[in-house]
Amino acid sequence: MTFTRLGSIQNMRIKIHCDASSNNQEDKISSTEGRVLLMENTESRKVNLFCWKAKKITSICRLVRGAETRALENGIDESIYFARMIHEIYSGKVDLKNPKQIQVKTATDNKSLWENLNNSRQCDEKLLRNSIALVKEMVERCEVETVDWVETLNMLADTLTKSGGSALWIKSVMEQNEL
């Protein structure tokens, strides 16, 4: 694993890949979430992978979209925390009433989740509506720049949630510091 200089804070953002697998734990009803966080220079596109996590989702998810939604919500929460902490480190200022942060850009490979976030229709699964509304609100408040859809082949967190996921792409990112 190598790290590269990313330059000034004005050109930095956190990029997060969130993924989930439904009903893949030993009990066959619990799901797994995974996330990979990168610091990215928005001009040079150079990245440093600095955090990854895989864990059991605490609530039972009926569908894959539910697991993906909860994984995205948890990943965004962690990303905003790091984005604010990085801004505090670089600026030397802490403002708890109006916290500043670097940009956060997210990625999911679940097309139906992405569609729910980018249209005005309500989600069919009523228990997910609050989570989807929260993510939409974070985008409106500019806590999250965008939620992008990526193909599963380009999902860095895929290897953290599935036994057959390929780790070649994430290995390449770690070695070359490029997406």
Locate predicted features.
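Amphipathic alpha-helical
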Residues: 1-6
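Extended hydrophobic-aromatic, low-complexity segments
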Residues: 27, 45-50, 83-84, 116
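Short loop/turn segments at secondary-structure transitions that flank enzyme active sites
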Residues: 20, 24, 43, 112, ...
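Glycine-rich, flexible loop segments associated with nucleotide phosphate handling
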Residues: 9-15, 48, 96-105
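A short, polar/acidic, helix/strand-boundary loop motif
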Residues: 37-70
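Two-metal-ion RNase H-like nuclease active-site motif
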Residues: 10-27, 72, 109
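Short glycine-rich loop/turn motifs
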Residues: 12-13, 30-37
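RNase H-like nuclease module associated with reverse transcription
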Residues: 58-179
